[in-house]
A protein has these predicted regions:
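Catalytic-pocket segment enriched in acidic/His residues
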Residues: 113-172, 176-190
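HotDog/MaoC-like acyl-thioester-processing domains
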Residues: 2-88, 157-160, 164-199
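Residue-level preference for alpha-helix termini and adjacent loops
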Residues: 1, 6, 12, 27, ...
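Short secondary-structure boundary micro-motifs
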Residues: 11, 29-31, 105-106, 139-140, ...
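Catalytic strand-loop segment that frames the active site of acyl-thioester-processing enzymes
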Residues: 49-50, 61-124, 138
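Generic detector of short, locally flexible boundary/turn motifs and exposed helical patches
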Residues: 9-13, 21-22, 87-88, 95-98, ...
């Protein structure tokens, strides 16, 4: 399961130009928690165009023993300066799985996710929530140039239950982002940015 990511934006990617991705496993750590053994794997993906690094994405992925899913949050979602409502349809989840080459059945196979994994419905991808959060941020701040974006999953969101993404400025060039619903916060994040034209 996706635990979180740290993205660094160095330069924009050019459409219709070749991109090289170099992926490296940078850390593997076993931990023991309330739900049993957990294996944390951190993978770094670096994207290059014309020999220059354009984007770096460090992903934290957790492998765990089968356990009942925790669906309730610990904190209510805050009131933000901007927010977008989302209704995650099964079609949206299927398409996101396809475009990201994500074959994990919890996102599109209803019998599997409900009968084998024990969730009440299809699980919304953590990166999809992050993508929707960045979209809401850039709609609210169209002149922002992204520098860094980090996010961490708190609990799963289930399709087709509505949720919202939103955020607020916390400093010059920094914003706090979140996603959640009536059950509480599901994802938290932070974006660093500068204002002005994209190079």
């Amino acid at each position: 399961m996706w635990a979180g990511s740290r993205l660094e934006f160095y330069q924009p990617l050019t459409v219709e130009a070749d991109v090289t991705c170099v992926s490296t496993i940078i850390n593997v750590e076993e931990k023991h928690g309330r739900t049993g053994s957990l294996l944390f794997v951190t993978v770094r993906h670096e994207y290059f165009q014309d020999g220059k690094r354009a984007l770096q994405d460090e992903q934290d992925i957790v492998y765990r023993e089968p356990t009942p899913p925790k669906l309730s949050g610990t904190e209510a979602i805050p009131q933000g300066q901007w927010r977008d409502p989302v209704v995650p349809s099964p079609t949206l989840l299927f398409r996101y799985s396809a475009v990201t080459f994500n074959g994990h059945r919890i996102h599109y196979d209803w019998p599997y996710v409900t009968q084998t994994e024990g969730y009440p419905g299809l699980v919304v991808h953590g990166p999809l929530i992050a993508t929707l959060n960045l979209r809401a941020f850039t709609k609210a701040h169209p002149n922002a140039r992204l520098k860094r974006f980090t996010f961490r999953g708190v609990r799963p969101l289930i399709s087709p239950q509505p949720f919202e993404v939103g955020g607020r400025l916390i400093d010059s060039g920094k914003a706090q982002l979140w996603a959640g619903n009536q059950d509480g916060t599901a994802q938290i994040g932070e974006v660093e940015f500068s204002l002005g034209e994209t190079p």
